[in-house]
A protein has these predicted regions:
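Transmembrane beta-strands of outer-membrane beta-barrel pores
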Residues: 43-47, 64-66, 77-81, 121-125, ...
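Hydrophobic, lipid-facing positions within transmembrane beta-strands of outer-membrane proteins
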Residues: 23, 37, 43, 54-58, ...
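Outer-membrane beta-barrel transmembrane domain signature of Gram-negative proteins
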Residues: 145-148, 173, 177-179, 186-246
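Flexible loop and strand-edge segments within Gram-negative outer membrane beta-barrel domains
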Residues: 80-100, 106-108, 112-167, 173-198
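Short loop/turn motifs that connect adjacent beta-strands in outer-membrane beta-barrel proteins
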Residues: 32-36, 64-69, 111-114, 160-166, ...
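N-terminal periplasmic accessory domains that precede
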Residues: 1-2, 7, 19-43, 54-59
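Membrane-embedded beta-strand positions of outer-membrane beta-barrel proteins
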Residues: 37-41, 71-75, 103-105, 113, ...
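Short sequence motifs at beta-strands and strand-loop junctions characteristic
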Residues: 17, 48-52, 63, 93-97, ...
Length: 246
């Protein structure tokens, strides 16, 4: 699935985007070349084996005989019980429940064009503090997060027959829904609700010079649009939402 990872250091470059403060990390994925599948499970004892970390992963790839279309699916399920190292009733490592599922597919519409679509869903639950089997507001100290994340993307690539021109048009979106609790002393006003919708669309054009001045070079240009809508609320005992600035 992953062909290589590129790490570029240093910020302030238009090639990295506005959110890349100290550089960027590019994860270059590869297309599946054959039908395959893998299922794995690991069980890890934490500390004195009073807590266990269970992790199950699954991935599979399907490719047509002419290799014009392919599909890669993946999934993960993880459960780790809370770990209390010094037996004081409070966890040093939180309780975790994670599920991830997604796929990436491609279809080569012609010799020089390709359409790529991907989707992923992540569900995560974290709970730390004490009295993990009780609601968070009944604990002396509790930190609890529950995320539901859905994201996907669509990309169209064109490569010229002489390999000098390359055009990519892409768009992606992700929606995050988070329920949280940060508080102590059985506080009923420490519940929070956060929703976030991020959308991005753009295009990139690359022209390859056989020789520019004294060496081969690439000219890269593009345009990108980003939109991020975040709403963060705290719930009170009266049901009134306090809306901080976002």
């Amino acid at each position: 699935m992953i062909e290589r990872v590129e790490v570029m250091r240093g910020g302030g470059s238009a090639l990295f985007g506005s959110s890349a403060i100290a550089g960027t990390i590019n994860i270059i994925t590869k297309e599946p070349l054959r039908n395959s599948g893998q299922l794995a499970h690991t069980l890890t004892a934490v500390g004195d084996a009073s807590a266990f970390d269970n992790n199950t992963t699954l991935n599979a790839s399907l490719v047509t005989d002419d290799q014009r279309a392919g599909l890669y699916v993946f999934g993960q399920n993880r459960y780790r019980s809370g770990y209390d190292h010094d037996d004081d009733g409070y966890t040093e490592m939180p309780k975790l429940k994670n599920q991830t599922v997604g796929f990436r597919s491609y279809f080569k519409t012609s010799t020089y064009t390709k359409l790529t679509f991907e989707y992923h869903h992540m569900q995560e639950f974290r709970r730390g503090g004490n009295l993990l089997n009780r609601p968070p507001h009944e604990a002396d100290i509790a930190e609890q997060l529950e995320h539901s994340i859905n994201g996907g993307g669509l990309k169209f690539d064109y490569f010229s027959p002489d390999e000098k021109h390359r055009l990519s048009v892409f768009s992606s979106a992700q929606h995050t829904d988070r329920d949280s609790y940060y508080g102590g002393g059985k506080d009923l006003n420490a519940y929070g609700k956060t929703t976030d919708l991020t959308f991005m669309a753009g295009a990139q054009y690359v022209y390859r010079f056989d020789q520019l001045l004294f060496m081969p070079s690439d000219l890269t240009s593009g345009v990108e649009y980003n939109r991020d809508g975040l709403e963060d609320n705290m719930w009170t005992t009266t049901g009134i939402r306090n809306k901080p600035s976002t």
